[in-house]
Swiss-Prot record:
Entry keyword annotation includes Flavoprotein: yes
Catalytically driven reaction(s): 5-O-(1-carboxyvinyl)-3-phosphoshikimate = chorismate + phosphate
Cofactor(s) needed by this chain: FMNH2
Example GO biological process: amino acid biosynthetic process
Cofactor-binding details, from the entry: Reduced FMN (FMNH(2)).
One term under GO cellular component: cytosol
Disulfide bond sites: none
Gene Ontology molecular function: any one: FMN binding
The protein's name in its UniProt record: Chorismate synthase
Keyword terms of this UniProt record: Amino-acid biosynthesis, Aromatic amino acid biosynthesis, FAD, Flavoprotein, FMN, Lyase, NADP
Gene assigned in the entry: aroC
Binding of NADP(+), residues: R48, R54
EC number per UniProt: 4.2.3.5
Family stated for the protein in its record: Belongs to the chorismate synthase family.
Length: 366
């Protein structure tokens, strides 16, 4: 398995399995001299960890992070930063009934056909449990971006199943388990999830992420365009089946006179491009949306096959999120931050001294 590393200058390599002794990552390329403690990382991990409400998996993992290297006396040294998170609440017996069968919608079948072996316990390497070290690495990236450039990366749930969640205020996001920016919708979301859980079914979600304060110039055309790398990173998150940047698929119905964001001395008029033009950041907010599919592990009986190709019926009884999107907001934020820090360092390496006579305009003219 060779696809375990994200990034070019700021790289993150994850390791571990869902029911192994531990999971973690190695961060390479982090600039030296930044203050960093385990508490800086833990605050982000606590936003993602399981067992925080009745609407998510009841697997009780503290997700306590250990910094093993790369930090001396509370400051990054520029050497690889190793983060370790120990698994403490594995319950592998829940997966005994899928040793010889494949769960529909999961990576069981594809991992088996590709590698000829698979860790059936909680999905092994394909489990969303492996997003915890991504959030840990994202905490490091967020801190550097915020301190060096004033960049803020924030996200929220904008849709759960058939329920739209209109944005009201960022302050609402941290006050409920759904990361909803609209407190008035939370009771409806709770009732929806309670009914779904009783049915033994699952549902998808939409998550929106915004990076503000990103300067103009980040991105490496043509094959490492900023939006291309963002899309790749987001699609690397478990269960993500779609990515939009800016107006996204709504661009199809927009005319050029509407979609093209005009430039004025006072700033841009509109942001249909989502903060990226030609693969390079414009200085506007970078806006990203992801579509997350329904959880594949459900109690509803589903048709499948055994390893020998015979018909089988699969019911999954483990502790699973009825909607993985509920805990996806900090994961999506982290992925965006990891792409941004990598491109910030790449831009500094080649074009850090470039100056033009044209003034940098504001992200919004209003």
């Amino acid at each position: 398995m060779s696809g375990n590393t994200l990034g070019t200058l700021f790289t993150v390599t994850t390791f571990g399995e869902s029911h192994g002794p531990a999971i973690g990552c190695v961060i390479d390329g982090c600039p030296p001299g930044m203050g960093l403690t385990e508490a800086d990382i833990q605050v982000e991990l606590d936003r993602r960890k399981p067992g925080t409400s009745r609407h998510v998996t009841q697997r009780q993992e503290a997700d306590e992070v250990e910094i093993l290297s790369g930090v001396f006396e509370g400051v990054t040294t520029g050497t690889p930063i190793a983060l370790l998170i120990r698994n403490t609440d594995q319950r592998s017996k829940d997966y005994g009934n899928i040793v010889e069968t494949f769960r529909p919608g999961h990576a069981d079948y594809t991992y088996w056909q590709k590698y000829g072996i698979r860790d059936y316990r909680g999905g092994g390497r394909s489990s969303a449990r492996l997003t915890a070290p991504i959030v840990g690495a994202g905490a490091v990236a967020k801190k550097w971006l915020r301190e060096r450039f004033g960049v803020e990366v924030r996200g929220y749930m904008s849709g759960l199943g058939e329920i739209d969640v209109p944005f009201v205020d960022w302050s609402h996001v941290h006050e409920n388990p759904f990361f909803s920016p609209n407190a008035a919708v939370v009771p409806e979301l709770e009732a929806y999830m309670d009914a779904l859980r009783k049915e033994g079914d699952s549902i998808g979600a939409r998550i929106d992420v915004v990076a503000s304060g990103v300067p103009v110039g980040w991105g490496e055309p043509v094959f490492d365009r900023l939006d291309a790398d963002i899309a790749k990173a987001m699609m690397s998150i478990n269960a993500v089946k779609g990515v939009e940047i800016g107006a996204g698929f709504d661009s199809v119905a927009q005319r050029g006179s509407v979609h093209g964001d005009e430039l004025t001395p006072a700033g841009f008029v509109g942001n249909h491009a989502g903060g990226v033009l030609g693969g390079i950041s414009t200085g506007q907010d970078i806006t990203v949306s992801i579509a997350i599919k329904p959880t594949s592990s459900i109690r509803t009986p589903r048709r499948s096959i055994t390893k020998s190709g015979e018909e089988a019926t699969v019911e999954t009884f483990g502790r699973h999120d009825p909607c993985v999107g509920i805990r996806a907001t900090p994961i999506a934020e982290s992925m965006l931050a990891l792409v941004l820090i990598d491109h910030a360092l790449r831009h500094r390496a080649q074009c850090g001294d470039v100056e033009t006579p044209t003034p940098k305009i504001a992200g919004s003219a209003t």
